[in-house]
């Protein structure tokens, strides 16, 4: 999923946003963030044919709350897009602080932003942020998706976040493996998991 998100994000920045200059701000203590940033950079450079298109790269650690130093440095390069794959709390704070500094670049992030808490932390500042995700709850894509959406809404009286769909699918994959293994023994279940084919979950096949 990370290679897909990184390359799609880069393609969107280049093809749809017509970005010429991109800055990266990474959660350097998070392998997810570092990996996603690398996939994005590699693909954007490939598309643009210009290694200098990545005008700045800044790092921070999980739990940081003040990003003024990184953002002040980024601002001087006037990027069109800032790719900021990280946890939703830090990412929302980054965007808020960027707007306070007068940075107008479009922000792109990964699926960790696809949660209501991102909007709660970021408020109006995160409006217009671009998010890649593996699940959309507006239109069911198959019967499993339809059943999941109905059950979640009936139980919790709200829309499900993408992570809930992923957890639901993980449960279904294991349940399917147990049935095919006809056993509760871990080794047999593991073997059945490796043989899973054409699984249709709420987030797709």
Question: Can you say where each PLM-predicted feature lies in the sequence?
Answer:
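Extracytosolic ligand-binding ectodomains
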Residues: 1-205
């Amino acid at each position: 999923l990370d290679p897909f998100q990184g390359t799609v994000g880069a393609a969107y920045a280049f093809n749809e946003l017509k970005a010429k200059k991109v800055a990266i701000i990474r959660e350097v203590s998070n392998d997810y963030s570092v990996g996603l940033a690398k996939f994005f950079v590699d693909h954007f450079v490939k598309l643009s044919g210009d290694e200098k298109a990545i005008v700045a790269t800044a790092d921070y650690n999980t739990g940081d709350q003040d990003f003024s130093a990184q953002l002040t440095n980024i601002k001087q390069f006037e990027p069109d897009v800032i790719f900021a794959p990280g946890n939703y709390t830090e990412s929302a704070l980054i965007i808020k602080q960027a707007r306070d500094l007068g940075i107008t670049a479009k922000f792109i992030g990964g699926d960790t932003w696809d949660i209501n808490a991102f909007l709660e932390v970021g408020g109006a500042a995160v409006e217009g942020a671009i998010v890649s995700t593996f699940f959309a709850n507006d239109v069911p894509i198959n019967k499993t998706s339809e059943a999941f959406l109905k059950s979640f809404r009936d139980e919790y009286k709200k829309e499900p976040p993408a992570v809930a769909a992923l957890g639901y699918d993980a449960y279904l994959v294991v349940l399917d493996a147990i049935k095919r293994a006809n056993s509760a023994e871990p080794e047999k279940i593991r073997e059945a998991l490796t043989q899973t084919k054409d699984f249709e979950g709420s987030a797709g096949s």
